[in-house]
Curated annotation (Swiss-Prot):
Belongs to the threonine synthase family. This is Threonine synthase. PANTHER family: L-THREONINE DEHYDRATASE CATABOLIC TDCB, THREONINE DEHYDRATASE, MITOCHONDRIAL-RELATED. GO terms for molecular function: L-serine ammonia-lyase activity; pyridoxal phosphate binding; threonine deaminase activity; threonine synthase activity.
Amino acid sequence: MSQWRGLLQEYKEFLPVTEETPLLTLGEGNTPLIPLENLSKEWGVKAYVKYEGANPTGSFKDRGMVMAVAKAKEEGSRTIICASTGNTSAAAAAYGARAGLRCIVVIPEGKIALGKLAQAVMYGAEVLEIKGNFDHALDIVRSISEKEPITLVNSVNPYRIEGQKTSAFEICDALGQAPDVLAIPVGNAGNITAYWKGFKEYHEKKGTGLPQMRGFEAEGAAAIVRNQVIEEPETIATAIRIGNPASWTYAVEAAAESNGKIDEVTDEEILAAYQLLAQKEGVFAEPASCASIAGLRKQIASGEIKKGSTVVCVLTGNGLKDPNTAMSTIDVNPAVLPNDEQAFLDHIKGGVPK
């Protein structure tokens, strides 16, 4: 069995890789497509999750970042910069470290999961906090990158989209064709853009078919659904707490071209899906990821997703990215028992399986 060589080598023919592009990798890609056996029976569909939390820094951002950082290095850049709600900063810092580049990340004040911040710090990034939200941070780093010899690695960087589209290839490779529906969280909207690009390119080359693209924003940050910029977006799903998505137009096009839809889910629906996925399937994803599961559940109930459909839900990040949400949404009160085996047996026998 040959070792996975990373995206720049495995999907070279579909990527802007030249003889001069450094073949940077941390082993990103090749993430599992997990069938949801229990929930599929309950909902009457063939549901899978594309578990992007298995990437090196724990999120889908690694796919785009390896491409963006490799091209930055190829072009002679010495510094990369990004605005981030967390996952982008972790990926940029890791691949920046691997490539030997200086990395600067700008985060919204007090609005980032600690697991993600810890990663950026450990990888050696310079972390700056802005007194504002993600959209303010992105405005500043975009402006700086236009004036200084610093490479912006947010999803407005076209190389990010190129790397992220590879997940669509992997889904088609695993299933033998595209699913009927691709359900995906929408924050800055780069990922839905990338998946649609990937499905179209693979279909053109291999005849794998095209899915409906169904994207899900959090209700408190549903700029595309409401067709207006949300000045102060708010949601428990910090990774998609974005009120002015950079790839807004492309996301709308992806939904329209594929006969899909951009929809919204509430924080309550997201948290219910977050717990359901972990407790019914043993898959722990960060809250924002579970917008795709919440959306699937919502649209099965509404009849928009038909029974019997093959659906892939993208889980964008690992649950360990945001342990605080898990601890704050579920009561953690372990029973304290004496150091006595019989006491444990009595307790266990008295318990009723969930």
